């Protein structure tokens, strides 16, 4: 019995050591990640390890895992425009590391490569591009400015083996003086538009009055010619038409009775029969 216990004890120690060695030699690379191997004898190996379970030599080697999925990052800076106006800009950058360059990225920058590189090159490119435009141009040509920033920033990031999937301006503000000047300009433009509308309306009314006056003058001239040609006949026709209109109006009123006299004098009688 004692011999069996001694044998079990002697086997337990190597078995525990073996299990520990086996566990330390196995590592997992999760989905969306890649790994590089650092060897104490040869340094960082050039091979990039894909997803899955892998083995290494304990103590001599260790794995460094990188997240290779696209990640967002904001880059903010305050700089001067071409006309010396202060501009505050914020960029939203979607970035990821170049997978095949992970060993070089780890050697030169480490796992926090994005923290070391993106703010630096982002500020550099923003200041360089903004300095080429006036403050007003940054507003009116925002799309062109964004494209210039995106193009230059992609080139700079590629030098560090970082791929940029998207670059966009999410925030742009100016100094108080420029903002106030823009507001005053907008107010002046609105006042000018309002004044132009008033002038156009007055001109339209004037033209309408001219046309109306010309029409009345032509009508008066036509009537004068008709009277001169036909004598009092036209005047009598107009009187009859006016009497007919009055009769139609009074007929619609149940409280009034209209009685033509039938006399030569042309007088009529109105009777109020209202209740």
From Swiss-Prot:
InterPro entries: Band_7, Band_7/SPFH_dom_sf, Prohibitin. It is a peripheral membrane protein. Transmembrane segments: none annotated. Disruption phenotype: Abrogates mitophagy. Defective morphogenesis of mitochondrial cristae; cells are sensitive to menadione (generates reactive oxygen species in the mitochondrion) and the mitochondrial membrane potential is affected. Decreases formation of secondary hyphae; double knockout with PHB2 exacerbates the effect. Decreases virulence on A.thaliana. No vegetative growth or conidiation phenotype. GO terms for cellular component: mitochondrial prohibitin complex; mitochondrion. Induction: Expressed in hyphae and conidiae, and highly induced during the necrotrophic stage of infection. Keywords: Membrane, Mitochondrion, Mitochondrion inner membrane. Pfam families: Band_7. SUPFAM superfamilies: Band 7/SPFH domain (SSF117892). Gene3D superfamilies: Band 7 domain. It is found in: Mitochondrion inner membrane. Its main location: mitochondrion. The mitochondrial prohibitin complex consists of two subunits (PHB1 and PHB2). The subunits assemble into a membrane-associated ring-shaped supercomplex of approximately 1 mDa. Interacts with ATG24/SNX4; the interaction is direct and plays a role in mitophagy. Belongs to the prohibitin family. Prohibitin probably acts as a holdase/unfoldase for the stabilization of newly synthesized mitochondrial proteins. Involved in mitophagy. Required for the switch to necrotrophic growth. This is Prohibitin-1.
């Amino acid at each position: 019995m004692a011999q069996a216990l001694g044998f079990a004890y002697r086997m337990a120690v190597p078995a525990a050591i073996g299990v520990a060695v086996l566990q330390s030699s196995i590592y997992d690379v999760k989905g969306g990640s890649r790994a590089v191997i650092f060897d104490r004898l040869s340094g960082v190996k050039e091979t990039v390890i894909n997803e899955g379970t892998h083995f290494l030599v304990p103590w001599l080697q260790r794995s460094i895992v990188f997240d290779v999925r696209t990640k967002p990052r904001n880059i903010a800076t305050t700089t001067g425009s071409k006309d010396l106006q202060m501009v505050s800009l914020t960029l939203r950058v979607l970035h990821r590391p170049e997978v095949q360059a992970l060993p070089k990225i780890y050697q030169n920058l480490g796992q926090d490569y994005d923290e070391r590189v993106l703010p630096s090159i982002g500020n550099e490119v923003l200041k360089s591009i903004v300095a080429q435009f006036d403050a007003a141009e940054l507003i009116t040509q925002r799309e062109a400015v964004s494209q210039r920033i995106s193009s230059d920033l992609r080139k700079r990031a590629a030098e560090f083996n970082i791929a940029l999937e998207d670059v966009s301006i999410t925030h742009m503000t100016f100094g108080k003086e420029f903002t106030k000047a823009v507001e005053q300009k907008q107010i002046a433009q609105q006042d000018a538009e309002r004044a132009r509308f008033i002038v156009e309306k007055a001109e339209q009314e004037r033209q309408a009055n001219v046309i109306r006056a010309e029409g009345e003058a032509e009508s008066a001239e036509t009537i004068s010619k008709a009277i001169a040609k036909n004598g009092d006949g036209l005047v009598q026709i107009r009187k009859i038409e006016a009497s007919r209109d009055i009769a139609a109006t009074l007929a619609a009123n149940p409280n009034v009775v209209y009685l033509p006299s039938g006399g030569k004098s042309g007088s009529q009688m109105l009777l109020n029969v209202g209740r």
